[in-house]
Amino acid sequence: GGKYLFYIFCGISISMAIIYYSSSKDKLDILFKIVGGILLVELCIALLESFTSFRLPISPYSSWLQYFGKDPVSFSDFDNIFVYSDFRPPTGFHWNTNNLAIAMILILPFFLCSHQIIVKVLGTIAITVIIIMAASRAVFLGLIIIICFYLGFIKKKIATLSLIWMVILGLFWGMAQLSESQNPRINEIANSMEALSLYLKGDIDVGGSLEWRRELVNNGLAALKESNGLGVGAGGSVPIQEKIGGVAGRFTSMHNFWIELLVEGGIIFFSLIIGWYISITYNLFKISKWRENPEIQYYGSALFLAMIGFVPAAIAASSTIYFFPMWIMFGLSISVIYAYRRKRFHQHTT
């Protein structure tokens, strides 16, 4: 419980520091450049880790790991389709490949919303590659949702979005029809597409990931019921899982951020948090439509998509309460909303 509260304190402190610092538009621009620069470096490192043997010393696959007092990670701990291969996915500045994927999904909208075509295309491709290498179902779903919301709500290209979905569905349907082809090369491609489809739908459960995640959730909901909906307290879900003996003999974190909030905070607190989250997201959506200040509109559009994509992506991590990019996203979102309101107030008073 104490460690959990410490994470919350650090996270809120980061968000508040961002809000306090971003008291002017110029400072907000500087902050975005600093955060963007750090995440851009991580993106480059993740690409190196994806296609070369390069690893940061803190990576769970680094040969230097023992000098940091840590043991090599059990790859089966990750919900990853490469679990039985020799491939080791990128981790960037994070210990867990899922956490890297979530960080990438949060910066994807800033590339998508860029007015520079080359930045938009190269950034989107790079992040998509990293997320595929991380092979996280929840984050991949977040990527699809972000692109759909970008085309539907930001660019308002409903026809383009519909065409893309028709092509994708047609591709999978066509591959399904070709799965019985006598041509071995066509048959191999078709079956690979079918395997990908089954994996994304959860019909292929790598390492029993979906099974133990469901068990963790069921244990948490049972504890919530015993508390009469009041919650088990901050960090309380971990001791409950430990008393049971841990799921699959080793998992004690909830591995679902939203269920974690519900189980630990209770129904009332959870409802307040969800209401707050929806309010922030809606305000960012309004800013994405405000054309009088292109920079604030850009920030609002990107953060709106990031908040949307984070909803499914947050399920990928064991917990995001200690995930600093989430707290940075919250701080930047509130800062942009305040900047928008200051601009609107200034317009009405002049």
Spans of model-derived segments:
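Membrane-anchoring hydrophobic segments
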Residues: G1-S23, D29-L40, M326-T350
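Transmembrane alpha-helices of multi-pass, membrane-embedded glycan-processing enzymes
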Residues: F6, C10, S23, G36-L39, ...
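Alpha-helical transmembrane segments of multi-pass inner-membrane proteins
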Residues: F9-A17, D29-F153, W165, I308-V311
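Structural signal for the C-terminal ends of transmembrane alpha-helices
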Residues: A17-K27, F111-I117, C148-K157, T281-K289, ...
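A membrane-periplasm/extracellular boundary helix in multi-pass inner-membrane enzymes
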Residues: C44, L48-F54, A134, I154-I204, ...
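Transmembrane alpha-helices of multi-pass inner-membrane enzymes
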Residues: A159, S279, S301-T350
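Long extracytoplasmic/lumenal interhelical loops at the membrane interface
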Residues: L198-G265, K286-R291
